[in-house]
Curated annotation (Swiss-Prot):
CDD domains: CYP2D. Signal peptide: none annotated. This is Cytochrome P450 2D11. The keyword Transport does not apply. The gene is Cyp2d11. It is found in: Endoplasmic reticulum membrane; Microsome membrane.
Amino acid sequence: MELLTGAGLWSVAIFTVIFILLVDLMHRHQHWTSRCPPGPVPWPVLGNLLQVDLGNMPYSLYKLQNRYGDVFSLQMGWKPMVVINGLKAMKEVLLTCGEDTADRPQVPIFEYLGVKPGSQGVVLAPYGPEWQEQRRFSVSTLRNFGLGKKSLEDWVTKEARHLCDAFTAQAGQSINPNTMLNNAVCNVIASLIFARRFEYEDPYLIRMLKMLKECFTEISGFIPGVLNEFPIFLRIPGLADMVFQGQKSFMAILDNLLTENRTTWDPDQPPRNLTDAFLAEIEKAKGNPESSFNDENLRMVVGDLFTAGMVTTSTTLSWALLLMILHPDVQRRVQQEIDAVIGQVQHPEMADQARMPYTNAVIHEVQRFGDIAPLPLPRITSRDIEVQDFLVTKGSTLIPNMSSVLKDETVWEKPLRFHPEHFLDAQGHFVKPEAFMPFSAGHRSCLGEALARMELFLFFTCLLQRFSISVPDGQPQPSNYRVHAIPVAPFPYQLCAVMREQGH
């Protein structure tokens, strides 16, 4: 007992501090060489956690980029990270070294939520045979699946009409468009996965969207960041269950939908939806322990498609309508092109896009300016690589700062302003600079890119074909400030949609 009092206690404390510092130094030394990227000096144990704002990481990285350059190091706890900025460095990492940077690091909060070998879905799965199998299945299904006798475009076009009908019911009123946009995009995903559509007033749909919103809130910000850096806190009884209530509730909703689908699935009939196609693959894979087609992975893949494909598209559409309010001259020019190419009676089709360079440019500029996913999910290096003459060692976590590419001053004429001419040449033809990477690039590019582009074009043109969007009477002009969350959304705003008259 005497050891724990007086000088003995101080000796124990000093020994403990020295031990922690030595362990910390060994962790750093494993990844440090003279050729490593520069970066801020880290604190022992905490690293650079106190030097960045976890609630607004893009701005923190912007300031660090100005100081240290396009490739710099961070130490988050004991995890070495390298942040990649600018088009040139991003191309090196995602394309030139794509095979060596396609892996995912382990994310403790996702492991707690059920991501594990055999049930890792496709978005979070490590780079390897399991990921390749699920990526191939998801991409081919999204591209080629015929839902009954309807193509995917038919489903999106049908939902665009329902969305316009919902706007018509509130024409001339002050409305928040986000709920209706979420409903429409969610129904497209539900049609693809379950061949099912919900009425916008359906309590089941309302609850599902509420839980999905909570999911994104729960995985962003300070607390999840701390849990990822110090996963020992996940062992505190009840803490993780309290933090991730929305995640569990949302997956329970998907489980119910999967159960309903399974009870009506007939393996002798052509698949009605993605779930049927996955169930058929499970049957084929029975007896093959190497296959990633199993019941647990089905729910993870479905969860990936909902979370990755729903809120991102609806948030982009929310930015689109806001920017049309703030730039009425752009809105009028889009409507003129719609009238000239499609007219005011015929429904928009994807085939119209090639003849509508200005509308296409506006949609692309909405994605660039909105910048809704500035920091995609991190990567991890599977071997040593060189980036901009710096050595990035094996096992380093990579943070691709897509915002630095979409707003790269060396590429874009007016990077911080909404300027559709970024995507038009001198003759008014549509052009797409290589710095346009809202869907990322390389092996881990967004698997739902084709579907998202279809939804953005058909929903946007359908709405502007039928309505003029403006600020409601008596309300202030909304701002283009952003809410730094996942995804990055505009501040809540109200709009007034007025039916367009024929010929206007």
